[in-house]
Amino acid sequence: MVSIRPDEISSIIRQQIEQYSQDVKVENVGTVLQVGDGIARIYGLQQVMSGELVEFEDGTTGIALNLEEDNVGAVLMGEGRNIQEGSTVKATGKIAQIPVGDALVGRVVSPLGAPLDGKGEIAATENRLIESPAPGIIARRSVHEPMQTGITAIDAMIPIGRGQRELIIGDRQTGKTAIAIDTILNQKGEDVICVYVAIGQKASSVANIIEVLRERGALDYTVVVAANASEPATLQYLAPYAGAAIAEYFMCKGKATLVIYDDLTKQAQAYRQMSLLLRRPPGREAYPGDVFYLHSRLLERAAKLSDALGGGSMTALPVIETQAGDVSAYIPTNVISITDGQIFLSSDLFNSGLRPAINVGISVSRVGSAAQTKAIKKIAGTLKLELAQFDELAAFAQFASDLDKATQNQLARGQRLRELLKQPQFSPLILAEQVAVVYAGVKGLIDEIPVNQVTAFVSELRSYLKTSKPEFIEKVQSSKQLDDAAEALLKEAIAEVKKNILAAV
């Protein structure tokens, strides 16, 4: 019989006690009371934060938005078809984040950073909060560098600067997305990171845009964030903030970035849907009371940072869709008041063949003139006024039978200026070409050319400058100024091209 050795037993027990670690995991859990329409009402979750991510039993994630006395209202980020009444919900202790890093460039991602392009996982370097505070007053500096769009009408009359918020507004099918995509294409070789956020669009439309960017080599410096029309309203609501977080990552590294939110009307509608389902009180047009804050906190994140913070910038081009040209509706007026100007696209101008269909009279850039290059500022000063006067005269001339010579000349000049500013899609002009085109129109050098030949004159002038006067392009592109030597070269080129056009007529 084995003898019991108490000292050995006590040493073993002591050893076990020393090795014991009290690993108690405290979880904040609740129970689903009700689920449906992308909303879950949860009982419990006493310690949950506003905007915190919660996890359901089936793996679906949600965001706690309504914190009430007896329940929590959460919006789902997935279908949530397997969530049942009485199932358990866990609070994660995290606020919505997106993985960011240089590897995002050239990729198509969801608002939560999941790859959508079938190219495998993205090697992110850090996580950023989807919602983060905008830079303060001291962190910013005024807008002073140009953000060239490649569209002559915009760069000459409604210039955009790096760090500006410029609204693109108009009815459906007036070319809003076309302007945004042209601006991305024009950033090639400019060391600008572009972020295109597609909100509530058809998957086929987004696929077409990605294909255009890929064909023209623009995907090499672009990130696409897509929340299609088939996605839950929560993801459509989060998509712009995710795009801003990605752009902020590059901005904080001292880079220039361009973000396009296409379009914020869909985001506001998604937010309205969520708010009404959460039983928040509706306001004007059934939007919740904080719909202004929805867009202001997003667009205020666009900035030109001070040199102490690296001098990076985020330029925002939000898109808003109007109904029958009504810019006095709730969402358009909100976003107009937040942004630094707007480019208004008119369906009447679009249908009359003027593309881009920019209504110069009510389009404005409030801070961009400080960033406009000297070359184009020097010659485009009177362009906007002349076109506005032409529109007024053209309306008046419909009723007047006999017009004096000066009025006839002004109408003829206006028609030619309007023709000059027509530009096909996906063909941005470099600065030197824009200077040449605007110079020819403003100085009256094409007044003898028939109106139907103006487009031919523009394309011939562009090719002539490239082949016969490359020194003009080189001078203007490098100095960003139109000096006397460059002006002399330009006059020669215009005279030569004009002679050829008139000879062929």
Curated annotation (Swiss-Prot):
Source lineage: Bacteria, Bacillati, Cyanobacteriota, Cyanophyceae, Synechococcales
GO cellular component, one term: plasma membrane-derived thylakoid membrane
PROSITE patterns per record: ATPASE_ALPHA_BETA (PS00152)
Family: Belongs to the ATPase alpha/beta chains family.
Entries under HAMAP family matching the protein: ATP_synth_alpha_bact (MF_01346)
Topology versus the membrane: Peripheral membrane protein
Protein function: Produces ATP from ADP in the presence of a proton gradient across the membrane. The alpha chain is a regulatory subunit.
Location in or out of the cell: Cellular thylakoid membrane
Residues flagged as site, Required for activity: 363
Superkingdom of origin: Bacteria
Keywords associated with the record: ATP synthesis, ATP-binding, CF(1), Hydrogen ion transport, Ion transport, Membrane, Nucleotide-binding, Thylakoid, Translocase, Transport
Catalytic activity, reaction form: ATP + H2O + 4 H(+)(in) = ADP + phosphate + 5 H(+)(out)
Binding site for ATP: 170-177
The UniProt record lists the keyword Thylakoid: yes
Full protein name: ATP synthase subunit alpha
